[in-house]
C-alpha cells in the first residue's frame, strides 16, 4: 500500500465530500466538523486538499502539535525530499523569540515565513499552510511591499554582475567569502552565490559576460549542486529589513478564498491577546529616541482575529464552535494503547477483520514494518490463511493512529503499536 491509496480512500469518504460541497462557491462558509481523533485530522485535510485548489490554513493550539501535523501532511504527500519550488505543504512559524528584539529572531523561521509569503504570491492556490497562534500573531509585510522587494532572475537574461551586486546590497544582503545562511552572497570570478530568503538552499548564478548562463541551488556544506533552475526570486529579510513598512495579518495576506481550519477560536483569541499584551509591555520600555512601529501595527490581537476570521471560510474541528454553521460529524476513535502487547494487538486486529475493517499499520521506516510483520507471522504460526489477520502495511509515519467507524473498511495504526 502507498500513500496515494490512503488519500484515495478518504477522497471517497462521505463526510469528506460533504465538506468539499459545503466549501464550493464564492460565499463564506461556516462548518463545525466533530469526531476527528488522532491523525484523522491531517488525513481528512489531505483528502480535501487533493479535491480542490484552495489555500488551506491549519491553525493548531501550539507549536509542537503544529510540527506533528506538518510532518504528517509532508509525509502523506511525499514532500519531505522535494525541492521547495515543488512543495505545497508549508510551515509558518514565529520569527521572534521576543518582540522588538531583532537580534532575537530565528533565521530559519524567518526563512520559513518568507517562503510561505513568496509561495502564496507566486502560486496563490493549492497550498496547505500549518501554523499556530504565536506565529499567527506576528503580522507580515503586504503583498505590494513584498513584490516591490523581490528581484526575479531568469536563465539567459541579460543582466550584469555589477547590477546584481548593487541590487543585493540595496536589499541588505551581506557579502561574505562563502554563503552559510540566508541574507548572504559571495562572488568568485563569474559566479555569484546568493542565499535568498525565498529558498531553503542558496543559488549559484553563473554568468557569461552580461548574461545569466545557469542557475542552480546547492548545498552550502558540501558545495554540491542540488537542482537546476530556470527562474528564481531573490528575497531579502522581510521580517527585519522592512520592519518600518506597513504590515497586515496573515488572514489579510492570503486569498479571501482561503479555508481556515481552527480547533478552538476562543482559545486562539485569548492567546493572541496575551501575545499583544506582551508586546505592549516590551514596547513601553523601549528607547523612545528610536522610532518603532506600535504593537498593534506589528501584532494581531484577539479582536482583530475575530473580525478578520469572520469574513473567511472557516472549519472548526474542536468540540465547540464559535460560528453558527453546518455540522459534519465523523466517527473516529483514538488508537488504543497496546504497550508492546502484540497478542492484544492481534486480537484487536482480528476483531476488526471479522467486522470487515481494513487494518492498515503505518510506520516511518520499512524496518519497523518488517519487524511487526515478522512478529505477527511468529504469533500466527500454525494458522490457516483464512485464520490469519488481514493487514496492509504503509510506510507513513503518522503521529497518531486512529480507527474510522464510518468507513468500516478503514483501520489505521501508527508505529506506536510497538512502543
Across the structure, where does each feature detected by a protein language model lie?
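ASCE RecA-like P-loop NTPase motor cores
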Residues: 1-411
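Single conserved hydrophobic/aromatic residue that forms the stacking wall/gate
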Residues: 412-419
Amino acid at each position: 500500500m502507498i500513500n496515494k491509496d490512503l488519500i484515495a480512500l478518504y477522497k471517497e469518504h462521505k463526510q469528506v465530500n460533504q465538506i468539499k460541497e459545503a466549501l464550493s462557491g464564492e460565499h463564506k462558509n461556516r462548518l463545525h466538523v466533530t469526531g476527528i481523533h488522532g491523525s484523522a485530522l491531517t488525513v481528512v485535510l489531505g483528502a480535501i486538499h487533493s479535491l480542490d485548489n484552495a489555500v488551506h490554513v491549519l491553525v493548531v493550539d501550539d507549536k509542537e502539535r503544529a510540527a506533528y501535523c506538518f510532518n504528517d501532511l509532508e509525509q502523506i504527500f511525499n514532500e519531505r525530499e522535494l525541492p521547495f519550488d515543488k512543495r505545497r505543504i508549508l510551515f509558518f512559524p514565529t520569527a521572534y523569540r521576543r518582540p522588538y528584539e531583532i537580534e532575537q529572531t530565528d533565521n530559519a523561521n524567518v526563512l520559513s515565513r518568507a517562503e510561505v509569503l513568496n509561495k502564496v504570491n507566486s502560486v496563490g492556490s493549492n497550498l496547505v499552510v500549518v501554523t499556530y497562534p504565536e506565529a499567527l500573531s506576528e503580522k507580515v509585510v503586504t503583498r505590494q511591499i513584498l513584490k516591490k522587494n523581490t528581484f526575479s532572475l531568469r536563465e539567459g537574461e541579460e543582466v550584469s554582475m555589477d547590477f546584481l551586486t548593487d541590487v543585493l546590497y540595496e536589499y541588505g544582503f551581506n557579502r561574505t567569502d562563502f554563503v552559510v545562511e540566508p541574507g548572504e552572497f559571495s562572488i568568485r570570478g563569474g559566479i555569484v552565490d546568493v542565499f535568498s530568503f525565498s529558498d531553503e538552499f542558496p543559488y549559484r548564478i553563473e554568468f557569461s559576460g552580461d548574461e545569466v548562463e545557469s542557475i542552480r541551488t546547492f548545498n552550502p556544506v558540501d558545495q554540491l549542486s542540488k537542482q537546476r533552475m530556470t527562474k528564481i526570486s531573490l528575497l531579502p529579510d522581510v521580517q527585519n529589513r522592512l520592519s518600518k513598512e506597513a504590515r497586515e495579518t496573515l488572514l489579510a495576506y492570503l486569498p479571501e478564498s482561503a479555508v481556515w481550519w481552527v480547533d478552538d477560536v476562543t482559545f486562539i483569541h485569548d492567546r493572541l491577546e496575551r501575545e499583544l499584551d506582551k508586546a505592549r509591555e516590551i514596547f513601553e520600555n523601549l528607547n523612545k529616541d528610536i522610532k518603532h512601529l506600535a504593537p498593534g501595527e506589528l501584532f494581531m490581537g484577539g479582536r482583530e482575529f475575530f473580525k478578520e476570521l469572520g469574513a473567511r471560510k472557516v472549519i472548526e474541528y474542536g468540540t465547540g464552535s464559535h460560528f453558527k454553521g453546518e455540522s459534519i460529524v465523523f466517527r473516529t476513535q483514538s488508537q488504543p494503547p497496546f504497550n508492546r502487547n502484540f497478542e492484544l494487538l492481534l486480537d484487536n486486529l482480528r476483531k476488526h477483520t471479522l467486522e470487515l475493517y481494513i487494518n492498515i499499520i503505518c510506520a516511518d521506516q520499512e524496518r519497523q514494518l518488517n519487524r511487526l510483520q515478522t512478529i505477527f507471522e511468529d504469533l500466527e504460526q500454525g494458522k490457516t490463511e483464512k485464520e490469519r489477520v488481514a493487514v496492509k502495511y504503509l510506510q507513513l509515519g503518522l503521529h497518531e493512529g486512529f480507527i474510522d467507524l464510518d468507513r468500516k473498511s478503514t483501520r489505521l495504526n501508527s508505529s506506536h503499536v510497538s512502543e
